[in-house]
UniProtKB/Swiss-Prot annotation:
The protein's name in its UniProt record: Type II methyltransferase M.PaeR7I
Single GO molecular function: DNA binding
InterPro entries (UniProt xref): DNA_methylase_N6_adenine_CS, MethylTrfase_TaqI-like_dom, N4_N6_ade-DNA_methylase, SAM-dependent_MTases_sf
GO biological process: DNA restriction-modification system; methylation
Quaternary context: Monomer.
Name of the gene encoding the protein in the UniProt record: paeR7IM
EC number in record: 2.1.1.72
Gene source species: Pseudomonas aeruginosa
Top EC class, one word: transferase
Length: 574
C-alpha cells in the first residue's frame, strides 16, 4: 500500500479540547499500565545503542538523536554519557550548549516522570563537570513534556531509540484514539500505541538513519501490524531482529513477546537475526559486533541472515520461539514428506551444459537421444513457459550408456564436442564412459507430473509441470504416487512449508533460502488418505489460482493449527 505524507505535524486545534483534556489526564494521572511504562535493563540499553550505531567512536555531537518516550531515563542517561564521551574525544572548541544543544530531542508525557528525569539529567551533567547553568540550558534544549504523537518535531534524526509505550487501544480515551487514527495510517484495527510510535519515529529518520526499539513483536505477524509492515517494506530496511522472548530484558516481566528491531532509512536488504541471547554485557557486546559487521563471518554463531523478510503487508517469518514450538508439534504429529508417499529429487547435472544442452529442435541427434529440458528461467512467472531448451541423453533404458555405433548422429554430435566433454573430472576418472552426464537421465521422469522448485529463492516458488519436461540441475522436483500434486503444491506454497525450510536451511550470502532436497525432506505432511475430500479440493483450487493466502487458509486447516499457531505464521489467528 502507498503511504501518504505523515500528518503527525498538524497542530492540535483549540477546538479539539477533548483531545488536549485526554492527553493532560494521562500526563497527570496515568498509572504505569495506562502510560505503558516499562523499564529496560542497562545491558539491553547498551546493546540497542551499539546496534543502532550510537557509539562513542562516532562524532555524536554532530548527529541528532530522538528518544520518543524517555520515562525514567533508562535510555536517555546512557545516551548522554556516550554523547559527552564522544564530544570530549573530538576536542571541541565551542561551548557545551552550542556544541551539544541539537544532539538530543527527548519527549515524555507524564508530568511527574518528566520532572524526575529532568532533575536526573541536570545532576548527571553537573557530575560530568558542566556548570549548573550549562546543565540546565542543555536539559531545557533536549527535553520536552508532551504527547510524542501530537507534539511538533523539528528536522530529522540520525537515530531514534527507546522503548515505546505499550498501551492497548481500550485504555486510550476515545477522543485521543480518534485523533491518533486520523494522523497515523498504521493505527489500524486493534493496534497498540507503540505502532504509531514506530511510524512517527521512522518518518522522522534522516537518510541512512537508524531506529532501534525494544517492544512487542506481535505487529510483525498479526493483522493490525499489516500497514506498518507495508511502510517498512516500502521505504526502509529491516536490518536486525533479536528475539528477546524469555530473556530478562526488563526490570519487570510485562511484555510477553519482546523483540529488538533495527530499521534503517535505506534500500531494502537482508535481515540479521538472533534469538534469546544471555543478558550479560560480554555476550551482548559480542553479539552486537556480529549483527553490525559489514560482512557476516562464515562462523556467525547465533546470527543468521534472511532475505526478503519484508514483503508488503505479509507477515515476517523470523523463526521466533512460538514458530519453533509449532515446528516441534508438527514434527511429533505428522510423517516426513517422503514417508507420506512423495519423492524429492534434483534435476540433471551434466558437467558440461554448453555441450549437452541446447535448443531442442537444433540438437542434431536421434529423436530418442534428447529430452525437452525445463530450467529456472522457464518457471520465473510461477507457470511453466518453456523456452525450447533440450538435453542430450546418452543413457539406455537398461541403465548403462548407449552404444554410439547404434546412434551415428549422437556420435557425431558428441565427437564434435569431445574435448569439452572428455575434459570433465568424471570423464577422466572413467575414460570409457567419457560421454556420460554426471547424473543418470531417466526419461520416464520427464513424463511424470511434478512440482519444480528452484534451489535458491527468497520465498517458496513451487511450480506445477504436467509431465513433458526434464528438470535441469538447479531445479528440485517432487513427485508422488499418493498425493494430488496440485494439493501438494498448496502445502509447499504455504507459510508452514516455508517455515520448515527457513528453520533448517543454510542461508546464502544476502540471506536467501536454499530449497534443497535435504531441507524439503524435513517438511511434515499428513498422509493423503487422511485428507477429507472437501479439503483436497480446496487445496488444489488454491494452488491452481496461485492464491497463497487461500493456500495458507486451507493448509492451516489441514494441520489443525490453533489460533495461536496461526497467529505465529501470520494473520490474526483466523
Amino acid at each position: 500500500m502507498a503511504f501518504a505524507p505523515s500528518v503527525a505535524h498538524k497542530p492540535v486545534a483549540a477546538a479539539v479540547c477533548p483531545v488536549m483534556a485526554a492527553t493532560e489526564a494521562l500526563a497527570t494521572e496515568g498509572g504505569l499500565e495506562a502510560r505503558g511504562a516499562i523499564f529496560t535493563r542497562s545491558e539491553v540499553v547498551d546493546f540497542i545503542l551499539d546496534l543502532a550505531g550510537y557509539t562513542e567512536d562516532q562524532p555524536l555531537h554532530e548527529k541528532r538523536l530522538l528518544e520518543p518516550s524517555f520515562g525514567g531515563g533508562d535510555f536517555l542517561l546512557p545516551i548522554i554519557q556516550r554523547l559527552l564521551s564522544a564530544w570530549r574525544a573530538a576536542r571541541p572548541n565551542g561551548t557545551e550548549v552550542d556544541d551539544l544543544g541539537d544532539a538530543i530531542r527527548a519527549v515524555e508525557l507524564h508530568h511527574d516522570t518528566f520532572r524526575s528525569t529532568y532533575a536526573a539529567v541536570v545532576a548527571l551533567l553537573k557530575r560530568e563537570g558542566l556548570s549548573a547553568n550549562a546543565a540546565t540550558a542543555l536539559a531545557d534544549r533536549w527535553l520536552s513534556q508532551g504527547d510524542f504523537l501530537l507534539a511538533p518535531l523539528e528536522g530529522q534524526f540520525d537515530f531514534v531509540v527507546g522503548n515505546p509505550p505499550y498501551v492497548r487501544p481500550e485504555l486510550i480515551p476515545a477522543p485521543l484514539l480518534a485523533e491518533y487514527r486520523s494522523r497515523y495510517q498504521t493505527m489500524y484495527d486493534r493496534a497498540d500505541i507503540y505502532i504509531p510510535f514506530i511510524e512517527r519515529s521512522l518518518t522522522a529518520l534522516s537518510a541512512g538513519g537508524n531506529l532501534g526499539f525494544i517492544c512487542a513483536d506481535r505487529w510483525m505477524k498479526n493483522r493490525y501490524g499489516g500497514p506498518l509492515r507495508s511502510l517498512v517494506a516500502e521505504r526502509f530496511h529491516l536490518k536486525v531482529y533479536v528475539d528477546m522472548v524469555d530473556t530478562p530484558a526488563f526490570h519487570s516481566d510485562v511484555i510477553a513477546y519482546p523483540a529488538i528491531t533495527i530499521i534503517s532509512r535505506e534500500g531494502g536488504g537482508a535481515t540479521r537475526i538472533a534469538h534469546r541471547p544471555s543478558i550479560d554485557r560480554a555476550t551482548l557486546t559480542t553479539l552486537a559486533g556480529l549483527l553490525s559487521a559489514p560482512t557476516l563471518p562464515k562462523d556467525a554463531g547465533p546470527v543468521r541472515e534472511l532475505a526478503r523478510v519484508t514483503n508488503g503487508a505479509e507477515p515476517w517469518l523470523l523463526e521466533s520461539s512460538d514458530q519453533m514450538a509449532l515446528i516441534r508439534r508438527l514434527e511429533g504429529a505428522f510423517p516426513l514428506l517422503e514417508e507420506a508417499g512423495c519423492k524429492v529429487g534434483i534435476g540433471v547435472a551434466t558437467g558440461a551444459d554448453k555441450a549437452f544442452i541446447g535448443d531442442f529442435e537444433s540438437l542434431d541427434v536421434e529423436p530418442d537421444r534428447k529430452l525437452p529440458l525445463v530450467t529456472t528461467k522457464d518457471i520465473m512467472t510461477g507457470e511453466v513457459q518453456w523456452r525450447g531448451q533440450g538435453v542430450i541423453n546418452p543413457f539406455a533404458e537398461s541403465g548403462g550408456l548407449v552404444d554410439l555405433g547404434e546412434y551415428p548422429r549422437l556420435r557425431r554430435y558428441l565427437e564434435a564436442r569431445r574435448d569439452v566433454i572428455a575434459g570433465r573430472h568424471c570423464a577422466k576418472k572413467a575414460p570409457a564412459n567419457w560421454y556420460r552426464t554426471i547424473d543418470r537421465i531417466t526419461p520416464a521422469l520427464a513424463a511424470r507430473p511434478k512440482l519444480l522448485i528452484p534451489d535458491i529463492k527468497g520465498e517458496s516458488h513451487i511450480v506445477f509441470e504436467g509431465g513433458e519436461l526434464y528438470p535441469s540441475h538447479n531445479l528440485y522436483y517432487v513427485t508422488s504416487d499418493d498425493w494430488d500434486l496440485r494439493a501438494l503444491q498448496a502445502v509447499l506454497l504455504s507459510a508452514v512449508s516455508r517455515l520448515f525450510v527457513a528453520t533448517y536451511s543454510t542461508k546464502m550470502r544476502g540471506g536467501f533460502l536454499r530449497f534443497q532436497a535435504q531441507y524439503l525432506r524435513r517438511i511434515r505432511i499428513p498422509r493423503w488418505a487422511d485428507v477429507p475430500e472437501p479439503l483436497r479440493r480446496e487445496l488444489a483450487e488454491a494452488a491452481i489460482k496461485r492464491d497463497v493466502q487461500a493456500c495458507n487458509r486451507a493448509v492451516f486447516r489441514l494441520y489443525g493449527l490453533s489460533h495461536e499457531e496461526r497467529s505465529a505464521l501470520g494473520g490474526n489467528g483466523e
